[in-house]
């Protein structure tokens, strides 16, 4: 890693680095429905190829396994959902967000909050919404109404 750091500092004055946290990976969508912030169910992401959830792992058929809802107990599911909703509120997100987390031991780490998550038929949000009982049409209607509601 020393060579990489030196190469970075040859061209830049600043760098942001963070600890690598290894553990189970989860992602959890949040929507706003009738003015209320509501969590969808969490998905567990299990890499089947490679060590990172990169473009290839995300979009190739054998890159990862997505388990929706995540196979965790109700306490852990609630904790993941509450963290996702808290992140959504604290960061001032509107309408839709998705929070990615790592579970290491018994501690959850927030990796990032995505304020423009994918909405394709293979994306996390539609799969999570379906488990919560929303069709894609209903989900889109909720999102559109949420924008109208916030005005």
Outline where the language-model segments fall.
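Phosphate-binding site of ATP-dependent enzymes
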Residues: 1-82, 108-109
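ATP-dependent carboxylate activation and anion-phosphoryl transfer catalytic cores
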Residues: 73-151
């Amino acid at each position: 890693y020393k060579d990489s750091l030196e190469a970075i500092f040859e061209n830049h004055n600043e760098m942001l680095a963070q600890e690598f946290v290894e553990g189970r990976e989860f992602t959890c969508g949040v929507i706003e429905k009738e003015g209320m912030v509501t969590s969808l169910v969490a998905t567990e992401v299990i890499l089947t190829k490679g060590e990172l959830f990169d473009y290839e792992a995300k979009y190739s058929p054998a890159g990862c396994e997505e388990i929706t809802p995540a196979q965790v107990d109700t306490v852990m599911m609630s904790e993941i959902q509450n963290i996702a909703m808290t992140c959504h509120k604290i960061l001032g997100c509107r309408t839709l967000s998705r929070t990615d987390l790592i579970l290491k031991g018994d501690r959850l780490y927030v990796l990032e909050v995505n304020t423009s998550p994918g909405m394709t038929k293979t994306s996390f949000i539609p799969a999570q919404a379906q488990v919560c009982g929303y069709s894609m049409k209903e989900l889109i209607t909720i999102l559109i109404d949420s924008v109208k509601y916030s005005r």
